[in-house]
Swiss-Prot record:
Its main location: membrane. Belongs to the UbiA prenyltransferase family. One of its GO terms (molecular function) is transferase activity, transferring alkyl or aryl (other than methyl) groups. The chain crosses the membrane at residues 39-59, 61-81, 110-130, 133-153, 160-180, 186-206, 229-249, 252-272, 276-296. This is Lycopene elongase/hydratase. The keyword Zinc-finger does not apply. The keyword Transmembrane applies. Disulfide bonds: none annotated.
Amino acid sequence: MSADMAAQSESGEGGDDGRADGGLGDRLVYLAVLSRPRFWLYLAGPVVVGVAAAASALADLFGLEPVALFAYFLVPANVFLYGVNDVFDADVDEANPKKDDREARWRGDPVNTVVVAASGLLGVGLFAVAPRVAWPWLAAHFFLAVEYSAPPFRFKTTPLLDSVSNGLYVLPGVAAYAAVSGSNPPMLAVAGAWLWTMGMHTFSAIPDIEPDREAGIRTTATALGERRTYWYCAATWVLAAVAFAAVDLRLGALLAAYPVVVLGIVAAGVDVDRAYWWYPVINTVVGMLITLGALWRLVNG
């Protein structure tokens, strides 16, 4: 599945107005591209980390709660999150170059709207599966997933709140930890993860600075400008590393990679449109190392 295929469909090859559907295969390709496959692990990855950190026995890794949470946050949650985003950003995205190749512009037909809404409603089933200690974290995730893009709050259009609200990405992992362990994770770990998402979100908004300014949208990145946004990201990632180091020095050392990388990007003059696509790989590697460390502890004590 490629963004090129979705782009072909949008350009009119699937229908006369560029928005008509060329069939089931075309629609599935479009929905897959809309869900940002490169970023699927941004929601599902924290679930894996949370489950591994909370497990006290190998059987805990494969219970109903962790499997259901991982399955939902791998694909349906991404269809919902990015679908809501694209619905309310349709006008802005007309001028966004990211939508030309790697992402898809919103097709406003009823079937796609129903699929996005159904993906959100599917998440309600998690409340029947997860214990009550996980409910507040799940509720917070769904609230932020909607209100980040949708009125009345539309956090993404308010500097700083757009950054802070992206804690929604770690909340599935917090919910998973709570579901498996029956208690909440260390709050310093939650704070560190939240700061990490603030940096990630604001870094990812750098390529959107000009399209957002042209559309009159104010974000942390548009308020700061490209250069100062790099420093903002570095600062949030340093604080994230400090918070994680207070939980475990090894975690702090891993998170220290983020400010080092962003400072390297600035020093080397790497184009942000190129560096933007490095972070899914970096996040996957860091998340994998944290998970493997937790599994090592689980197996070896």
